Amino acid sequence: MFNDRYELTDLVLSGQKTQTRVLIKTKDEFLDGEFNWDSAGTMVTFCKNEKEFIDIKSPYFFGEEIAVTQRHKKAGENNTHNTPNTITITDIRFERLQDISDEDCLKEGVKRASLGFYVEGIKVKNWETESHRETASGCLKLFPYPQEAYATLINKMYGKGTWESNPYVWAYDFELVK
């Protein structure tokens, strides 16, 4: 559920990441039409016209408990996160990717530094010319705004141009169950 390349699972297990977005993949011609979503917040119906529609179900539902595991490389005998962990979905929203607020970017795992924002695993290409933050894991790229850091993360995870295409997403708030 979370991308370990950018240490997102670790952020969940430490309580620093409390929100995630899942891209909705369907035929684009339906996404230009009108839509309605059910009161439970688990399904959206897109209507292309009076006769053509498509239902898109949320992969997760309100109150669902989901197991969170670390990649095997990190899960060792001395690892305190080696025990089973779960999160509980506390809110579901349906929105466009670029509708994310600065506050929600931080809930997604973007971190605040004294001179900008960064994401674990997104390193600078040229530390002499780019703003960066030096950490134990290397020189991480600094961004002036949380949305810019999040947009870069999304494009690295899902492919170049994903942020710019502004797809619909399921946005989930969750709590770590101790």
Q: Where are each of the predicted segments found?
A:
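Secondary-structure transition motif
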Residues: 1-178
